[in-house]
């Protein structure tokens, strides 16, 4: 089995592809098959989210491109930006992964959320496409007091 433990940042073209849906692209430990049929084991840092187009470096030197596989999604559109913001708020309140586009939101297909969105007045269309949701506010890490970020802890009583 081919082992992949790191990302590739160079200019070499990929020689193979690893197609995964979003659920699998959030796994840092994974056994899968490349487009060539070769079996691969991913051992990436915990918390890694793979994105379509990223390149990985196999232990044998091969460069493998990540492909975001098409999956069942719902595209949400609204009559105006305020209604779309309201739909986004309610999805975020439920901690739903959301992909943002110009005038639309996309979520993984879910009949309960579909009903909620329709109830909010949104137009909801099923589609099959790659899913690349927002990574979240802390996806690139956040800083803590004492780490040089300038953050301060304010103690009660002015201490």
Swiss-Prot record:
UniProt keyword annotation of Cytoplasm present: yes
One GO CC term, this protein: cytoplasm
Listed InterPro entries: UreE, UreE_C_dom, UreE_N, UreE_N_sf
Cross-referenced Pfam families: UreE_C (PF05194), UreE_N (PF02814)
Source superkingdom: Bacteria
Keywords: Chaperone, Cytoplasm, Nickel, Nickel insertion
Subcellular location: Cytoplasm
Molecular function in Gene Ontology: nickel cation binding; unfolded protein binding
Xref: SUPFAM superfamilies: Urease metallochaperone UreE, C-terminal domain, Urease metallochaperone UreE, N-terminal domain
GO biological process: protein folding; protein-containing complex assembly; urea metabolic process
Claim: Chaperone is one of the keywords in the record: yes
Gene3D superfamilies xrefs: Urease metallochaperone UreE, N-terminal domain (2.60.260.20), UreE, C-terminal domain (3.30.70.790)
Purpose: Involved in urease metallocenter assembly. Binds nickel. Probably functions as a nickel donor during metallocenter assembly.
Record family assignment: Belongs to the UreE family.
HAMAP family associated with the record: UreE
Full protein name: Urease accessory protein UreE
Organism in which the protein naturally occurs: Azoarcus sp. (strain BH72)
